[in-house]
């Protein structure tokens, strides 16, 4: 939060590029691009983003990454907020006030055609990498962890 270069994302390479678990906040877009470049990757190589939940530090750059071509995967309860983040942003603005932009940057809506709503136990395979969405409510009422068998 507000630390230059700090991103709450995990990168996993696959046969056609890479996927991310978490997008990180919108304020870290430049740092994310730089870290990808260090690994010989471009934004266009990010095929998918799997969100654990929709809090701004975990999902804030999801809409931006969707506009670069990534498919965004999320819990059913989080999907409406990614399509229309106004309620989420209004709530966060009451907490963070003038620090919203500095901490979180821009939070763009995810286009519906780029959004994948996952169910508990659902297995998704991307570029030969399979993962299973496992509902773990607690930190948020719309929380997943992802189980990777081959990573």
Task: Describe each region flagged by the PLM.
Residues 11-13, 120-150:
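Core dinuclear metal-dependent hydrolase active-site scaffold
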Residues 21-24, 47-53, 74-75, 135-138, ...:
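Active-site neighborhood of phospho(di)ester-bond hydrolases with catalytic His/Asp-centered motifs
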């Amino acid at each position: 939060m507000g630390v230059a270069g700090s991103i709450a994302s995990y990168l996993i390479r696959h046969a056609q590029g890479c996927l991310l678990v978490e997008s990180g906040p919108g304020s870290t877009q430049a740092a994310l691009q730089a870290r990808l470049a260090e690994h010989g990757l471009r934004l266009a190589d990010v095929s998918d983003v799997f969100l654990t939940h929709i809090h701004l530090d975990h999902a804030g750059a999801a809409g931006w990454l969707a506009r670069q071509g990534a498919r965004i995967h999320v819990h059913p309860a989080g999907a409406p907020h990614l399509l229309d983040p106004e309620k989420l942003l209004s709530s966060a603005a009451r907490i963070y006030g003038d620090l919203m932009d500095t901490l979180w940057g821009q939070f763009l809506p995810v286009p519906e055609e780029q959004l994948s709503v996952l169910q508990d136990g659902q297995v998704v395979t991307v570029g030969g990498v399979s993962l299973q969405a496992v509902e773990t409510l607690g930190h948020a009422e719309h929380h997943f962890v992802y189980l990777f068998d081959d990573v």
